[in-house]
């Protein structure tokens, strides 16, 4: 399959913006350059006229729980631990594989329609999440969440390992797998060491929640005499590739550890704000060389999966927190949501930029609209002015999965109907 995108304003993220074409063959970008300069030997099977559109790499949602779309609006305005123990965990105990499948498809629709092409997910019944990903056409890094203090901890680890063996590299390479220890307060050091050993054997990374709340910091300090970051260093977790969600409360020593170990951080500003967890020291992390991407967290604590809005929030929150309007400029935020996210997930050799050799994950934004005019700076427009409705066309791995805001891979009405029924049944059963 050969696809040609013509006459777009291209923001490749790597290198300067230009007006031109992007040519794709067998899912890979083979040309990105000025209009009319595509090699004469390239014969497109399909051509998209992107006049009046901006082309960017697909957005990368570095941390979410896709099936929790089913709990959107169910448990709001509560502290994190009360939210988990009183509301979320009881209803999660009722979830079936079918429930998680429909919740994940609902999340997939929402992500595609807001420009996300790749997401990192930690949950359970992950075979059904992977099935949804395969069907809807997204790219994803998936892991089974592991609770070390549970009576089923060993079984969960075995299931997590089996999931990796089944799905890592599946869906024509669109699905990658990790192991997912939930957090230091649910996974004691002895259990974490088992997870680390398994990740070494399977040669995959780890996805964990770290330093999210002050309560977590105080609990870990009381139990182990150190910060969660220092505890992870001591257990050997950081000897493996790690995706650390949140990292809100960090000392300078913590930041140095993250930088030295090459830990990837998923910054989730809206979830952190909604749960009053705090403001992550993103500026200090970036200055120290920590890899930072952007995530939404789950729709139960955000309450959407809108990476367009998340970019704007990330930029504005750091400016007001630092008292400095120059920090996190638009171009850097867009980079964090694309190439930066790819680095955090260990996928930088495949996605994140519009360069020859990369997989063709492309978003076309319709910009000939009042709120995106005049065209002084499209990078700034995407961060400060655009909305999810401006996403017109989405391409994943060279396949057009949404055109004119219509998702082509699944029936949207069926997904909405099934998700609504599922969510109502769950809440009525609690």
Swiss-Prot record:
Keyword Metal-binding: yes
Reaction(s) catalysed by this chain's protein: S-adenosyl-L-homocysteine + H2O + H(+) = S-inosyl-L-homocysteine + NH4(+); S-methyl-5'-thioadenosine + H2O + H(+) = S-methyl-5'-thioinosine + NH4(+)
Cofactor annotation comment: Binds 1 zinc ion per subunit.
Molecular functions (GO terms): 5'-methylthioadenosine deaminase activity; metal ion binding; S-adenosylhomocysteine deaminase activity
EC numbers for this chain: 3.5.4.28, 3.5.4.31
Name this polypeptide is given: 5-methylthioadenosine/S-adenosylhomocysteine deaminase
Keywords attached to this entry: Hydrolase, Metal-binding, Zinc
Domain of life: Bacteria
Residues bound to substrate: 92, 144, 182, 212, 297
Protein purpose: Catalyzes the deamination of 5-methylthioadenosine and S-adenosyl-L-homocysteine into 5-methylthioinosine and S-inosyl-L-homocysteine, respectively. Is also able to deaminate adenosine.
InterPro entries xrefs: Amidohydro-rel, Deaminase_MtaD/DadD, Metal-dep_hydrolase_composite, Metal_Hydrolase, MTA/SAH_deaminase
Statement: the UniProt record of this protein carries the keyword Membrane: no
Gene: mtaD
Source organism of this protein record: Desulforudis audaxviator (strain MP104C)
Chain sites annotated for binding Zn(2+): 63, 65, 209, 297
Co-factor(s): Zn(2+)
One Pfam family in the UniProt entry: Amidohydro_1
Similarity remark: Belongs to the metallo-dependent hydrolases superfamily. MTA/SAH deaminase family.
């Amino acid at each position: 399959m050969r696809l040609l995108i013509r006459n777009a304003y291209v923001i490749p993220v790597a290198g300067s913006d230009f007006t031109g074409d992007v040519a794709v063959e067998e899912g890979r970008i083979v040309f990105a350059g000025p209009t009319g300069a595509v090699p004469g030997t390239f014969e497109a099977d399909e051509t998209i006229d992107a006049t009046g559109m901006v082309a960017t790499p697909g957005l990368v949602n570095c941390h979410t729980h896709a099936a929790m779309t089913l709990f959107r609006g169910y448990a709001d305005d509560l502290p994190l631990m009360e939210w988990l123990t009183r509301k979320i965990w009881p209803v999660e105990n009722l979830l079936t594989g079918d429930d998680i499948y429909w919740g994940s498809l609902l999340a997939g629709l929402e992500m595609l329609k807001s420009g996300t092409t790749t997401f990192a997910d930690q949950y359970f019944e992950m075979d059904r999440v992977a099935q949804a990903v395969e069907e809807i056409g997204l790219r994803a890094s998936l892991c089974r969440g592991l609770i070390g203090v549970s009576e089923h901890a060993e079984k969960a680890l075995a299931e997590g390992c089996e999931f990796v063996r089944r799905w890592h590299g599946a869906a024509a390479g669109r699905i990658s797998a990790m192991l997912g220890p939930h957090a230091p307060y649910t996974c004691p050091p002895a259990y974490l060491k088992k997870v680390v050993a398994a990740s070494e054997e399977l040669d995959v990374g780890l996805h964990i929640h770290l330093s999210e709340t002050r309560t977590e910091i105080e609990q870990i300090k009381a139990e182990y005499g150190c910060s969660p970051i220092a505890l992870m260093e001591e257990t050997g977790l950081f000897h493996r590739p790690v995706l650390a969600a949140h990292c809100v409360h960090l000392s300078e020593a913590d930041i140095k550890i993250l930088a030295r170990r090459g830990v990837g951080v998923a910054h989730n500003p809206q979830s952190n704000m909604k749960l009053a967890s705090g403001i992550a020291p993103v500026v200090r992390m970036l200055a120290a060389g920590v890899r930072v991407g952007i995530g939404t967290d789950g729709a139960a604590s955000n309450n959407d999966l809108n990476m367009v809005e998340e970019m704007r929030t990330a930029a504005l929150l750091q400016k007001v927190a630092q008292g400095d309007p120059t920090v996190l400029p638009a171009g850097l935020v867009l980079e964090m949501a694309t190439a930066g996210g790819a680095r955090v997930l260990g996928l930088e050799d495949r996605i994140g930029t519009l360069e020859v050799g990369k997989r063709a994950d492309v978003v076309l934004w319709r910009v000939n609209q009042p709120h995106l005019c005049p065209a002084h700076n499209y990078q700034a427009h995407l961060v400060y002015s655009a909305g999810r409705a401006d996403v017109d066309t989405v391409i994943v791995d060279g396949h057009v999965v949404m055109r004119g805001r219509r998702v082509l891979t699944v029936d949207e009405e069926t997904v909405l109907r099934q998700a609504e029924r599922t969510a109502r049944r769950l809440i009525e059963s609690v």
